[in-house]
Amino acid sequence: MDLSRIPAQPKPGVINILIEIAGGSQNKYEFDKDLEAFALDRVLYSSVKYPYDYGFVPNTLADDGDPLDGMVIIDEPTFPGCVIAARPIGFLEMIDGGDRDEKILAVPDKDPRYAHVKSLNDVAPHRLDEIAEFFRSYKNLEKKVTQILGWQDVDQVKALVDQSIKAYK
């Protein structure tokens, strides 16, 4: 899979998220650049499952040295390798293993059920709490420490995406 052909931002206000892990999975897949394929990194040590599809924004570089992470609120899980054109609505700031690690939260741009969702204010607070709790707890049994710093709304996303695209280039 040639990731260079997948633009980070196909149009203003929309990003591409390459799915690595389908919602509901305990398997943690990662895209292996050398193999150009998805490989099983590990099975989560705890009983938690990814609440929604999870992946990364191609052709970006975040502060942790990896592409910018993203989670897509979607009703039907997709599959590893699926590219979702998504509208970012905010991001979760956290520290993972001592490094800053932002997780963009987005909705599918082509799903009419989410046409009204423009910011974190359009998502039930309990849903945001569940997502934050997933990231807080899923590494506990691996003895890895994460710290949740909080949610940033949609007005902060553009700067994060632009910075990550610039860092990649």
From Swiss-Prot:
Q: How is the cofactor bound?
A: In the presence of Zn(2+), Mn(2+), Cu(2+), Fe(2+) or Co(2+) ions, activity is very low. In the absence of metal ions, there is no activity.
- What is its cofactor? Mg(2+)
Annotated residues that bind Mg(2+) 1 are located at 64, 69, 101
Q: Which InterPro entries match?
A: Pyrophosphatase, Pyrophosphatase_sf
> Record-annotated residues binding Mg(2+) 2?
69
- Record field: catalytic activity: diphosphate + H2O = 2 phosphate + H(+)
| Alphabetical UniProt keywords | Cytoplasm, Formylation, Hydrolase, Magnesium, Metal-binding
The record's GO molecular-function terms, alphabetically, read: inorganic diphosphate phosphatase activity; magnesium ion binding
The keyword Cytoplasm belongs to this UniProt entry's keyword annotation: yes
User: What PROSITE patterns has UniProt attached to this entry?
Assistant: PPASE (PS00387)
Which family does this protein fall into?
Belongs to the PPase family.
**What is the documented function of this protein?**
Catalyzes the hydrolysis of inorganic pyrophosphate (PPi) forming two phosphate ions.
State what protein this is by name.
Inorganic pyrophosphatase
Which species does the entry assign this protein to? Nostoc sp. (strain PCC 7120 / SAG 25.82 / UTEX 2576)
This protein's gene is called ppa
